[in-house]
UniProtKB/Swiss-Prot annotation:
Listed PANTHER family: PROTEIN TRICHOME BIREFRINGENCE-LIKE 4, PROTEIN TRICHOME BIREFRINGENCE-LIKE 9-RELATED
Keyword Transmembrane helix carried by entry: yes
Cited function: May act as a bridging protein that binds pectin and other cell wall polysaccharides. Probably involved in maintaining esterification of pectins. May be involved in the specific O-acetylation of cell wall polymers.
Membrane topology field: Single-pass membrane protein
Gene: TBL4
Cellular compartments annotated: Membrane
Protein name: Protein trichome birefringence-like 4
Record-annotated membrane-spanning stretches: 19-37
Length: 457
């Protein structure tokens, strides 16, 4: 194994592996600090793994950023206790996961059924429901993600629901996060004997806003899986120009205010932002970006994005109670447009298999380099789900022309419509993201008996 000092030394430009392993380390400590330890001490995988890593805390670039926030960090750093003799043993698969970068791997053929069958989950939006919209092939469902250094467990919805008993999971971000949210709801629902025990959360019934908030409650487990629309994470606003005309701006110095009270106290918050920063007005940056009363005449999108991510990070560090809430950030999901962009004739139809060449590498998004740098400087540990590489290869997984039903007149489905080469069919690729989320939660506290899972998250 690599020298732990080198693995966990955060430099000014940390590697993706460093970000991953460091995030996993702190997530493990979070789960221990906020868990009830009256019945179980930390599992072998957590106590042995984290006890080795505790010494690495001395080698972080800014250790004061972790200790200056009063007692929060001290508490979770000191919560790791030795394993008791009568503690359950941990399976070798979970042990293996603890030292593995699960986001570095390849897609392999797998003829097993998806976690939920096409057409069987009523919560999939039509624009992601490729089966309903007439997609004839199913080969894109016959591949699973295989990390290079380990095997990941198959998604077990019953076990995950037990881990989430009494908890709130909130996805905050753009429609790619909504893609992942719908996938998780459907994956969990598929394991229920009584599918009617899932209820839609309605704003008027729960004192929640009707616009931009969506949620489902798993009644028998008293847990909810919610989505909040916040494509930039920062506040969309408007100003009145010198001619008295209102125009949209994006407040780079202000988190989206209307929704933060909903998720700041959630148990798990999963953020993302990326694709909306590639649209024309954000990319051009003319008279659109605002800080305080200043509207920039022109601002490069990279600088604007960096300011926005710092605003998000500052809000998280100031408002999230890290002994209660675990924070995730989902990386940039690859698009695969040919011959144009989403609004200029770009295409991806006809793709039925992933790219098989393992040496293929897409262009690593500059946005993720910004996110990685900012996360490395935060005092709140953030688990970074770097899904960029695993989506590079999946040219076959997009709705393309099957983002809506074919014309009943028999016209070609591609005629007169733009193709969706950014989002993903469901079931499909986002199910693998949630499999990695599930694996992460398993590693962070070990595979203890089912009866104890609910109290350990």
């Amino acid at each position: 194994m690599a020298d732990l000092k080198n693995l966990f030394l955060i430099t000014k430009h940390p590697s993706t592996t460093q970000i991953f392993l460091t995030s996993l380390f702190f997530l493990s400590l979070f789960l221990l600090s906020s868990s009830s330890l009256s019945d179980f001490s930390p599992s072998l995988i957590v106590s042995s793994f984290t006890s080795r890593l505790l010494t690495a805390a001395n080698f972080f670039s800014s250790p004061s950023s972790y200790t200056s926030s009063a007692s929060d960090t001290t508490m979770f750093l000191s919560s790791v206790s030795p394993r008791r003799i009568n503690e359950p043993k941990i399976d070798s698969e979970t042990k293996e996961l603890a030292s593995c970068d699960i986001f570095d791997g390849t897609w392999v053929f797998d003829d097993s059924e998806p976690v939920y069958l096409p057409g069987y989950c009523p919560f999939v939006e039509d624009k992601f429901n490729c089966f309903k919209n007439g997609r004839p092939d199913s080969g894109f469902l016959r591949h699973r993600w295989q990390p290079h250094g380990c095997s990941i467990p198959r998604f077990d919805g019953k076990k995950m629901l037990k881990m989430l008993r009494g908890k709130r999971v909130v996805f905050v971000g753009d429609s790619l996060n909504r893609n992942m949210w719908e996938s998780l709801v459907c994956s969990l629902r598929s394991t229920l004997e009584d599918k009617n025990r899932v209820s839609k959360i309605i704003g008027k019934q729960s004192n929640l806003p009707n616009e931009g908030f969506y949620g489902f409650r798993f009644n028998d487990f008293e847990c909810s899986i919610d989505f909040i629309k916040s494509p930039f994470l920062v506040q969309e606003s408007e100003v009145v120009d010198v001619y008295g005309k209102r125009r949209e701006t994006l407040r780079l110095d202000m988190i989206q205010r209307s929704m933060t009270k909903i998720y700041k106290n959630a148990d798990i918050v999963i953020f993302n932002t990326g694709h909306w920063w590639t649209h024309q007005k954000t990319y051009e940056g003319k008279g659109y970006y605002q800080e305080g009363n200043r509207v920039y005449e022109r601002l490069e999108v990279k600088e604007a994005y960096t300011k926005a991510i710092h605003t998000w990070a500052d809000w998280v560090d100031s408002n999230i109670n890290s002994t209660k809430t675990r924070v995730f950030f989902v990386g940039y999901s690859s698009s695969h447009f040919r011959k144009g962009a989403w609004n200029s004739g770009g295409q991806c139809d006809g793709e039925t298999r992933p790219i098989q060449n393992e040496t293929y590498t897409g262009v690593y998004p500059w946005m993720m380099k910004v996110v990685e740098s900012v996360i490395s400087e935060m005092k709140t540990p953030v688990f970074y789900m770097n899904i960029t590489k695993m989506t590079w290869y999946r040219t076959d997984g997009h709705p393309s022309v099957y983002r809506q039903p074919a014309d009943p007149r028999g016209t070609s489905p591609a005629a007169g419509m733009y193709q969706d080469c950014s989002h993903w069919c469901l079931p499909g690729v986002p199910d693998s993201w949630n499999q990695l989320l599930y694996a992460t939660l398993l590693v962070s506290h070990g595979s203890l008996p089912d009866k104890s899972l609910g109290s350990l998250l």
